[in-house]
């Protein structure tokens, strides 16, 4: 039987996600790279890009401008499935060119022998 939202696993994933969020908002590329699965199967759908494989994700991170990357996060939801799979979703506000935009993000996480890794991610903005 699948255990949904074991409190210890959900707490662990929430802490890891907050580490990801801090790295994202401070452009800590090394931490971001370490949190993504290093595999050709990893996928990240961004606002303007579709990235397939860890090489694409790494290249995107390294080329991303470190200016104005902070955002206000809300409605963070972590749902765990047993001790090795989780979905993380949230909404955020971010100012782009003086306009506050509402966005959303979803990630699938999987626990490997080397720890938890993001295996799939999606980021998008709602229409203005």
Residue ranges of model-derived segments:
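Short, solvent-exposed coil/turn segments at beta-strand boundaries
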Residues: 81-84, 112-114
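Beta-strand elements of well-folded, non-transmembrane domains
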Residues: 94-96, 109
């Amino acid at each position: 039987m699948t255990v949904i939202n074991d409190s210890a696993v959900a707490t662990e994933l929430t802490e890891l996600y907050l580490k990801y969020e801090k790295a994202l908002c401070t452009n800590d590329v090394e931490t971001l790279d370490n949190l993504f699965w290093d595999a050709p199967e990893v996928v990240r759908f961004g606002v303007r890009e579709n990235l397939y494989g860890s090489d694409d994700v790494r290249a995107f991170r390294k080329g991303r401008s470190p200016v104005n990357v902070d955002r206000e996060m809300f409605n963070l939801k972590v749902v765990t499935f047993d001790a090795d799979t989780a979905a993380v979703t949230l909404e955020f506000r971010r100012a782009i060119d003086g306009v506050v935009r509402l966005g959303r993000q979803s990630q699938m996480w999987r626990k490997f022998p080397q720890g938890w890794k993001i295996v799939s991610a999606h980021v998008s903005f709602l229409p203005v």
